[in-house]
C-alpha cells in the first residue's frame, strides 16, 4: 500500500475532493510531478482512488469504503471489500481538521489506524502507509495552497472533549476542557441566577434526575455509538457507547442547569410567602369593603349633594344642622347676578349654566351637519328634522307635527281663531332659539276653549252688526217713496 501511494501515478476523478487529495499527494512526493492523463481517462474510468496495478478497483468499492468511513454501521464492513476500500482517500475525507490538530494527536493517528487496520484484516505495512500519508496531507505547504483545509475545524474542541478515547469521563464533568460546549460543574455564565435557598438547586443536580436522564436516553446509545465508531475509527477519535451516552447526558444536564434555573427560583419560599401575604391582604380588603358597603354608599350619597356650588347649597353647608330645611327643599339657584332661576335638580342647573357660559357639548353626528347644542333634548328635537319623525298628532284631523308648539297653533285653526293659521303648518326647526316650555294637554285644551269663546263672541258681534245694517236699510226703503 505504501509503495502504491508513493510510487504510483494517481488517476484523477471529477470530484473536487479527489483532486484535492491527489494534489496533496503530489506536494508530499519528492519525485517530479507527473503529467495529467488524457481526457479520455476521465470519461472512461470514473473515480478510482489509488488502485493497485495487480487488482482493478471499481467505483462501487471505493464509494463503499468512503461510506463506511463517514457514516457506516461498523468497521466490520471493511473486511468485506478489497484493500483499496480502506484507502488514503478515506482517511483524508474523515480528517478535515487543521495541522495543529494532527500534530497534537499524531501518535494517536498511527496507533488507532493500526488498530483499525488489524480489526479490518489489513497488514501493518498498509497501516504504516496510511499514517505516512496523513503526515503528508497535513503540511504547511497544503495550508498555504488550500487555506480551507488548514482552517481550524469549528467543532475541534467538541471532538476533543466529547469523543476522544483517552480523555476520562471525570475530566469532562470537572471542566478540564476550556471550550464553550463543555459543561462545568459550577458555571459562571450570565444566564445563571444565584439562589440563596440552595435547596431547589441541589435537587436539580442530585443523582436521581441524572439516573432518569440516562434511562430516558438509553434508546439512543446504540445508533450513536455505531455512528461515532465508524466515522472516527480511522482518525483516532473513536469512542464507546458510554462516552456517547455521557455526551448526551451532559447536554441534557446543561439544559436542566442553565435553561430552567432562572425560572425555578421565582417559585422559592420567599416569593410564595410574599404572594400569600398579598392574597391575604386582598381578601381582608374585600371583607372590609363588604362590611362597610352601606356606610360608603351613604357617604357617597351625602357627598354627592355637597358637590353643588349654588348659593343655596353653600348656605346650607355654612349653616350646618340649621340648614336642614334648605337641604330638604332641594332647591338649586343660579349664581349669575340678575338671573335668579331655581331648579329642583343639579343636572338641570348645570344645563342652565351652559346658557351663560356658551358651552354646547351635544353635537349632531348626521352627515355634513355638525350642529352643537346646549341640552340633549334640543339635539333630539334637531335629529327629527333629519329623520322626518313627527311625534305630535292633531286629535281632530290626525295631522302630525314635529313640535308641540306647531300642534297648538294648528288646533287654533279648528276653533276658528284664524289669526294663528299663518305659519301653523311650518315644520322648520327653531333649535337655535331658547328651548320653549313644555305644554301639557290641560294647557292645550284651555287654549282651545279660550279661542272658541273668542270665536263665538266675534260671531255674535258680526250677527248684531248685520241685524243693525238690515234694520237701517228697511227704514230707508220705507221713507223713500214718500219723499218722491
From Swiss-Prot:
InterPro entries: Znf_C2H2_sf, Znf_C2H2_type
GO MF terms held by the record: DNA binding; sequence-specific double-stranded DNA binding; zinc ion binding
Residues that span the membrane, as ranges: none
Mapped zinc finger ranges (C2H2-type): 332-356, 362-386, 392-414
Chain positions of motif 9aaTAD: 178-186
Region called Disordered, residue ranges: 409-446
Stored SMART domains: ZnF_C2H2
Keyword Phosphoprotein: yes
GO biological process assignments: embryonic limb morphogenesis
Gene3D superfamilies: Classic Zinc Finger
Residue(s) carrying Phosphoserine: 440
Highest rank taxon of the organism: Eukaryota
Keyword list, A-Z: DNA-binding, Metal-binding, Nucleus, Phosphoprotein, Repeat, Transcription, Transcription regulation, Zinc, Zinc-finger
Signal peptide as annotated in the record: none
Statement: the UniProt record of this protein carries the keyword Ribonucleoprotein: no
One cellular component (GO) term of this entry: nucleus
Cellular location(s): Nucleus
Main location: nucleus
Entry note about domains: The 9aaTAD motif is a transactivation domain present in a large number of yeast and animal transcription factors. In SP9, the motif is inactive.
Function field: Transcription factor which plays a key role in limb development. Positively regulates FGF8 expression in the apical ectodermal ridge (AER) and contributes to limb outgrowth in embryos.
Family: Belongs to the Sp1 C2H2-type zinc-finger protein family.
Protein name: Transcription factor Sp9
Organism name: Mus musculus (Mouse)
Name of the gene: Sp9
Amino acid at each position: 500500500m505504501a509503495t502504491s501511494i508513493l510510487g504510483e501515478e494517481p488517476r484523477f476523478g471529477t470530484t473536487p475532493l479527489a483532486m484535492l487529495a491527489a494534489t496533496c499527494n503530489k506536494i508530499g512526493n519528492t519525485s517530479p510531478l507527473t503529467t495529467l492523463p488524457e481526457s479520455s481517462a476521465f470519461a472512461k474510468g470514473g473515480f478510482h482512488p489509488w488502485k493497485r496495478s495487480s487488482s482493478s478497483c471499481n467505483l462501487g468499492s471505493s464509494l463503499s469504503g468512503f461510506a463506511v468511513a463517514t457514516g457506516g454501521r461498523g468497521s466490520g464492513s471493511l473486511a468485506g471489500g478489497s484493500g483499496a476500500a480502506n484507502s488514503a482517500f478515506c482517511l483524508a475525507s474523515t480528517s478535515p481538521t487543521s495541522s495543529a490538530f494532527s500534530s497534537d494527536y499524531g501518535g494517536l493517528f498511527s496507533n488507532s489506524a493500526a488498530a483499525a487496520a488489524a480489526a479490518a484484516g489489513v497488514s501493518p505495512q498498509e497501516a504504516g502507509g496510511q499514517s505516512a500519508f496523513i503526515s503528508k496531507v497535513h503540511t504547511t505547504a497544503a495550508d498555504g495552497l488550500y487555506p480551507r483545509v488548514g482552517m481550524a475545524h469549528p467543532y475541534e474542541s467538541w471532538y476533543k472533549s466529547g469523543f476522544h478515547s483517552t480523555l476520562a469521563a471525570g475530566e469532562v464533568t470537572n471542566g478540564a476542557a476550556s471550550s464553550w460546549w463543555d459543561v462545568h460543574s459550577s458555571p459562571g455564565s450570565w444566564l445563571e441566577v444565584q439562589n440563596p435557598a440552595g435547596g431547589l438547586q441541589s435537587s436539580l443536580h442530585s443523582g436521581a434526575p441524572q439516573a432518569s436522564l440516562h434511562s430516558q436516553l438509553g434508546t439512543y446509545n446504540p445508533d450513536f455509538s455505531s455512528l461515532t465508531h465508524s466515522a472516527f475509527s480511522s482518525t483516532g477519535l473513536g469512542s464507546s457507547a458510554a462516552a456517547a451516552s455521557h455526551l448526551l447526558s451532559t447536554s441534557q444536564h446543561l439544559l436542566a442547569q442553565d435553561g430552567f434555573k432562572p425560572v425555578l427560583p421565582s417559585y422559592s419560599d420567599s416569593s410564595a410567602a410574599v404572594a400569600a401575604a398579598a392574597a391575604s391582604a386582598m381578601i381582608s380588603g374585600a371583607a372590609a369593603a363588604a362590611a362597610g358597603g352601606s356606610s360608603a354608599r351613604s357617604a357617597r350619597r351625602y357627598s354627592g349633594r355637597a358637590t353643588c356650588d349654588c348659593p343655596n347649597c353653600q348656605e346650607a353647608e355654612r349653616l350646618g344642622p340649621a340648614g336642614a330645611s334648605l337641604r330638604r327643599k332641594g332647591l338649586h339657584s343660579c349664581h349669575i347676578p340678575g338671573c335668579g332661576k331655581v331648579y329642583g335638580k343639579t343636572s338641570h342647573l348645570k344645563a342652565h349654566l351652559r346658557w351663560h357660559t356658551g358651552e354646547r357639548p351635544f353635537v349632531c353626528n348626521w352627515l355634513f351637519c355638525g350642529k352643537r347644542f346646549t341640552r340633549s333634548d334640543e339635539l333630539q328635537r334637531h335629529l327629527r328634522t333629519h329623520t322626518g319623525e313627527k311625534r305630535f298628532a292633531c286629535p281632530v284631523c290626525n295631522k302630525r307635527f314635529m313640535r308641540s308648539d306647531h300642534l297648538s297653533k294648528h288646533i287654533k285653526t279648528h276653533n276658528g281663531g284664524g289669526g294663528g293659521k299663518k305659519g301653523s303648518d311650518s315644520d322648520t326647526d327653531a333649535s337655535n332659539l331658547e328651548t320653549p316650555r313644555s305644554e301639557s294637554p290641560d294647557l292645550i285644551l284651555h287654549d282651545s276653549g279660550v279661542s272658541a269663546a273668542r270665536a263665538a263672541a266675534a260671531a255674535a258681534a258680526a250677527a248684531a252688526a248685520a241685524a243693525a245694517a238690515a234694520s237701517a236699510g228697511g227704514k230707508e226703503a220705507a221713507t223713500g217713496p214718500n219723499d218722491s
